[in-house]
């Protein structure tokens, strides 16, 4: 609980300031530090016995799962979360850019650096898994777990077997996780912060106080006895079904209602590389079509595997979000 309080106080202290003096300054420090820490971990992991086994596992494709809907849902959720797609974060940050910004260039830099960092980090993760597999005699496939299981179960076990090196590498690894979590939380909070300020005329400090207070109360549910189960359900819904559905909806709105063809000139302005008809086709037809297929088969698979409780919780979350959104909109009308 103390850790939760400290984290939310840090988030509040940073978010109550203006973008450049708050998130901007913190990101300039935490993001480079995150890269330096992960670089140290990756370089060290490549010196461990068995690292080649882990890298071989990472780079060896398993074509048998190519048509597994859960693989595609996991891939979508990973890239959506890491690039903060469909959550108004990019839109919020873009509103601060000057008129002559090279949008396409910026997008390419963000996507390339994000994907490059993830691949770079994966070499370190699988090298450490290879080391554990060799030293413990357990097949590496049995060590690979998702999300919190990998971070808070597998890696602590690995670090405990490393002796002095693990005592150095372990704190660095979890410090990197902390930095990544704080910067992600700040990013998720910023669109809500701007919306509250614009809709209700609150100061940034007051808006940050309200949102961080609500966030803290909600976070308390994830510290109870069933926290891991709640995290699994909420994370699976938000990253795999909720956000995926919103992105498909955004494609329809921007592609068919608002007229994405009119945005090409704005997007291409001042950029070295340009988008054209192919980009429009992807937004209007290909992306929503693929998402709809994956989303539908994902729901069917969830029902077939008996995930009725998970689906029920997901429905409750969805209805809660919709009701809260409608209530806030109505409240704005009567303010």
Q: Can you name each region flagged by the protein language model?
A:
Residues 2-5, 108, 205-210, 244-245, ...:
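Hydrophobic alpha-helical transmembrane segments
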Residues 3-7, 11-43, 239:
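Membrane-interface loop-to-helix entry segments
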Residues 232-246, 276-335:
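A generic transmembrane alpha-helix motif of multi-pass inner-membrane proteins
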Residues 35-59, 127-131, 218, 222-223, ...:
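Hydrophobic alpha-helical segments and their helix-loop junctions in multi-pass secondary transporters
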Residues 188-202, 226-233, 252-277, 333-334:
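Alpha-helical transmembrane segments
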């Amino acid at each position: 609980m103390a850790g939760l309080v400290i984290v939310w106080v840090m988030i509040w202290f940073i978010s109550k300031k203006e973008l450049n003096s708050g998130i901007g300054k913190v990101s300039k420090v935490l993001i480079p530090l995150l890269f330096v820490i992960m670089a140290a971990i990756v370089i060290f992991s490549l010196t461990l016995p068995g690292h080649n086994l882990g890298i071989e596992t990472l780079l060896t494709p398993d074509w048998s799962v190519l048509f597994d809907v859960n693989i595609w849902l996991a891939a979508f959720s990973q890239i959506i979360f890491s690039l903060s797609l469909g959550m108004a974060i990019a839109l919020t940050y873009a509103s601060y850019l000057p008129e002559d910004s090279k949008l396409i260039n910026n997008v390419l830099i963000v996507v390339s650096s994000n994907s490059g960092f993830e691949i770079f980090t994966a070499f370190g993760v699988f090298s450490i898994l290879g080391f554990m597999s060799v030293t413990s005699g357990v097949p590496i496939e049995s060590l690979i777990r998702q999300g919190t299981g990998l971070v808070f179960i597998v890696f602590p076990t690995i670090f405990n077997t490393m002796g002095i090196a693990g005592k150095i590498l372990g704190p660095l690894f979890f410090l990197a996780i902390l930095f990544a979590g704080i910067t992600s939380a700040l990013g998720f909070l910023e669109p809500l912060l701007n919306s509250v300020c614009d809709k209700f005329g609150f100061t940034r400090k007051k808006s940050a106080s309200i949102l961080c207070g609500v966030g803290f109360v909600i976070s308390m549910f994830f510290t109870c006895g069933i926290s891991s189960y709640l995290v699994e359900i909420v994370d699976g819904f938000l990253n795999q079904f909720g956000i995926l559905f919103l992105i498909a909806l955004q494609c329809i709105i921007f592609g068919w209602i608002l007229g994405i063809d009119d945005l090409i000139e704005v997007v291409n302005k001042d950029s070295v590389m340009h988008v054209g008809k192919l980009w429009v086709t992807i937004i209007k037809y290909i992306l929503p079509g693929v998402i709809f297929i994956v989303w539908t088969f994902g729901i069917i698979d969830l029902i077939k595997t008996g995930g009725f409780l998970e689906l029920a919780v997901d429905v409750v979350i969805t209805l809660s979000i919709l009701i809260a959104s409608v209530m806030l909109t109505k409240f704005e009308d009567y303010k």
